[in-house]
């Protein structure tokens, strides 16, 4: 999106703030239905960031796949869970919660130290997509494939990992 600087910064700050609030809602809300709706809010904010980065195809895929399918699947699985099970548990902090919190705090900090030191040149091992498009011998579907294999390789792979984790989580919740 070609927005003036201050408007772009305001949208990024607003999206980040709502993303953090939604993430806290996913983790801290005791009602699983509200937690699932908070997850939907987080996924919508992530698609807003993709729109701000001019990555419209990934934003639409994010909305359709995650908000439209995965989040609905999670809410569907949560609706099958008996509500009285969640209200009986009054133990708010356990050792497992402490371990989970430690892991959730350590992973972002390790990523923040690892990502800047990584050479990302190897990811773009193919020719650039604009060089291929200049040939004019390909149609729109091939252009989308080329963009996914070059420009959007890293976001596409991250989205596929998130999709896999969401699917495993939904299956686990449905089994319980």
Swiss-Prot record:
It is a multi-pass membrane protein. NDH is composed of at least 16 different subunits, 5 of which are encoded in the nucleus. It is found in: Plastid, Chloroplast thylakoid membrane. NDH shuttles electrons from NAD(P)H:plastoquinone, via FMN and iron-sulfur (Fe-S) centers, to quinones in the photosynthetic chain and possibly in a chloroplast respiratory chain. The immediate electron acceptor for the enzyme in this species is believed to be plastoquinone. Couples the redox reaction to proton translocation, and thus conserves the redox energy in a proton gradient. Keywords: Chloroplast, Membrane, NAD, NADP, Plastid, Plastoquinone, Quinone, Thylakoid, Translocase, Transmembrane, Transmembrane helix, Transport. It is an enzyme of class 7 (translocase). It catalyses: a plastoquinone + NADH + (n+1) H(+)(in) = a plastoquinol + NAD(+) + n H(+)(out); a plastoquinone + NADPH + (n+1) H(+)(in) = a plastoquinol + NADP(+) + n H(+)(out). Its main location: plastid. This is NAD(P)H-quinone oxidoreductase subunit 6, chloroplastic. GO terms for cellular component: chloroplast thylakoid membrane; plastid. The keyword Cell membrane does not apply. GO terms for molecular function: NADH dehydrogenase (ubiquinone) activity; quinone binding. Gene3D superfamilies: NADH-ubiquinone/plastoquinone oxidoreductase chain 6, subunit NuoJ. The lineage of its organism: Eukaryota, Viridiplantae, Streptophyta, Embryophyta, Tracheophyta. The chain crosses the membrane at residues 10-30, 33-53, 60-80, 92-112, 152-172. Its EC number is 7.1.1.-. Belongs to the complex I subunit 6 family. InterPro entries: NAD(P)H-Q_Oxidoreduct_6, NADH_UbQ/plastoQ_OxRdtase_su6, Nuo/plastoQ_OxRdtase_6_NuoJ.
């Amino acid at each position: 999106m070609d927005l003036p600087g201050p408007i772009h910064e305001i949208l990024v700050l607003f999206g980040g703030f709502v993303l953090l609030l939604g993430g806290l809602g996913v983790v801290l809300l005791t009602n699983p239905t509200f937690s699932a709706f908070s997850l939907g809010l987080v996924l919508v904010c992530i698609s807003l960031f993709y729109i701000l980065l001019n990555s419209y195809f990934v934003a639409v895929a994010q909305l359709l796949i995650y908000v439209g399918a995965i989040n609905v699947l999670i809410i569907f699985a949560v609706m099958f869970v008996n509500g009285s099970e969640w209200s009986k548990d009054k133990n708010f902090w356990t050792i497992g919660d402490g371990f989970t919190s430690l892991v959730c705090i350590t992973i972002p900090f390790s990523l923040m130290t690892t990502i800047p030191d990584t050479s990302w040149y190897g990811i773009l091992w193919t020719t650039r997509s604009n060089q291929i498009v200049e040939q004019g011998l390909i149609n729109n579907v091939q252009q989308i494939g080329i963009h996914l294999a070059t420009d959007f390789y890293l976001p596409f792979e991250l989205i596929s990992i998130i999709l896999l984790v969401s699917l495993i989580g939904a299956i686990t919740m449905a089994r319980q």
